[in-house]
Amino acid sequence: MSIPGLGQIAPQAPTTTQRTINLRPFGEWRFSIPHQHSTFSSNSSAAGVTVRLVAGTAERDGTELAPNCVYTFLPGTKSKLFTDQGCTLEINNTGGYPLEDRVVEHPPEQSPMLSYINLHFGLQDHERAAAAQAQQQHPTHHQQQQQGRGAGAGVARSKPGPRVLICGPPGVGKTSLAKLLAALATRMGSQPLVANLNPTDGLLCLPGTLGAAVFGTLMDVEEPAGGFGVTNTPISGPSAVPVKNPLTFYFGHEKVEDDVDMWRQMTERLAVLARRKFERNRDVRVAGLLVDTAPVEAGDKEGQELLGWAVRQFDANFVVVLGSEQLKTELGQRFASEKTSFEEPITVLGLDKSDGAVQIDKAWRQKSTETAIKEYFFGGIKARLSPFTQSASFDELVVFKAPDEPYEGAPVLERVEITPEMAHWTLAVMIASVTDSPQAIRFSSVLGFIVIADVDQERRRVKFLSPVSGRLGNHPLIWGRWPEPYLNLLA
C-alpha cells in the first residue's frame, strides 16, 4: 500500500559524535562520564566513550596508551589523559553519554605534572641506591658461589627503597598521585608495594577495606578506578591486563574516625605484613612503598597524629603533602626531629594539587560504591561474571559484628543471629575458622564477600550471592556498618 508523500521524506543524516583533539606538550584532556542511568544499557555496543591515540604519546595516571588502539572509558569515570610530547586523540561518543570534557594546556614549567614526574625521578635515585646496597649485602647465589660463600651468607639487613606516604586535604588527588607513581615505577621495571589506609576507597577490593598489593605489571587504563578497582583482581576467566593479588583487611566503616582504635590496629598489622614482604622479596624491598591515606587538613591534630602513627608503622622516609602549604609546614615541624629505623631523616615534601583535581560528592561516591559491588559479583564490560545464588540454614553460617558504638573494653566482635535486617548487606568472608577467637577473626585477611539476598525467618534459611560455588565451610562472616545496602543485586 502506497502512502502519498512518504517517499519524499529525506532520510535523516546520522549524527556524528566523533571528533579529534590535538594536545600540545604537557596538555591534558580532562573528562567526566556520569554513572550509568537506566536509559543506557550495559549490553549496548556503545558501552562508553572510546578514545584512540592517533599520533604522539598519551597516558592515564602514568600508564601509556598504545597507538591506534581503541580504549573504552566507562560511565562513572572522572580522569584525564596527559601528554608530555603532544598527541592527537580521536574521541567517539556514539552512546550519547552526557560527556563533560575540556582541554587544559599549561606551559611545562607551570604544570603540576612536572613536579610529580620530578618526584618520580627523585624516588628512582633512592631506589637505585637501595639496589646497590642490596647487591653488595645480598649477592646472588651465582656470585656467592664465585666468592666461595654459602647461599646463606650476606644476610645483613639492607636499607629498602623509598617509603612514601601521600597525604593532604580532601579532593587534592592523593590516589591519582599514588597511581601515577606506581605506574611510572612499573614502567621502569620496578615492583613497588602500594598500601591504602583510606577505607572510603578500597584498593583492588570493595570500599570499607584497608589493603596492600605489589604492582609490578601493567595497570588497566579503561576501568573507572584506573587500575585500583576490583576488576584488576583474579577472576574465573581471561583478563585484559595482568591481575594483582591484594592483601585485604575488613574495616567495615566509611571513615577512619568511625573506629580509630581499630584503624590503628589494622594499620599496624598491615605494616607488619609489608615488612615481611620486604624481607621475602628483594625486588619489592628495593622498589619501596607507596601509602595512600585518608584526607587530613591543616590544624587537624587528631588526623595528623594518625598520620604520624602510619609514618612510624610503615617506617616512611618521605611524606608528600598535596595541596596545602600549611599542612606541609605543620608536618615538617612534627617530623623534624624524627628518624626512621635506618636513621634516615623523614623528608616532608609539598606539592601543588592539579587544578583538575576535584572533591567527589556524596552522590557520586555512593554510585561508585554500588558499581564496585556489582562489578565484584557480575564483572565489568570486558569480563562478564556469573555469581552463584546459594541457600543455607541459619546453623550453617556464623556471623560476627562489631559493636555499633565502640567503647572502652568492648569486644572487637560479637556473634549475632541472622535476621531479616541483614538483607542486601555485603558480608566479608574471613580467612579464619569459626573456632578462632574474635580477635583472631577480626584481624584475619579477607577471603572474599557475599551479599545476603533474602532471609526466611520462618524456615530459618538464608539466600546469598557468592562469586564461587560451594559451601562456606567453617569460614566466619563479618557484618560491618559500611558499605550500606544500597541496592538489591538480584532485582
UniProtKB/Swiss-Prot annotation:
Assigned GO CC terms: mRNA cleavage factor complex; nucleus
Stretches with biased composition (Low complexity): 130-148
Gene3D superfamilies: Clp1, DNA binding domain, P-loop containing nucleotide triphosphate hydrolases, Pre-mRNA cleavage complex subunit Clp1, C-terminal domain
Binding site for ATP: E28, K78, G171, V172, G173, K174, T175, S176
Keyword Lipid biosynthesis in annotation: no
Residues covered by region (Disordered): 128-160
GO MF terms held by the record: ATP binding; ATP hydrolysis activity; polynucleotide 5'-hydroxyl-kinase activity
Subcellular localization, as worded in the UniProt entry: Nucleus
One of the GO biological process terms: tRNA splicing, via endonucleolytic cleavage and ligation
Keywords, ordered alphabetically: ATP-binding, mRNA processing, Nucleotide-binding, Nucleus
Record carries keyword Nucleus: yes
Similarity comment: family membership: Belongs to the Clp1 family. Clp1 subfamily.
Function recorded in the entry: Required for endonucleolytic cleavage during polyadenylation-dependent pre-mRNA 3'-end formation.
Assembly description: Component of a pre-mRNA cleavage factor complex. Interacts directly with PCF11.
Entry protein name: mRNA cleavage and polyadenylation factor clp1
Taxonomic source organism: Neurospora crassa (strain ATCC 24698 / 74-OR23-1A / CBS 708.71 / DSM 1257 / FGSC 987)
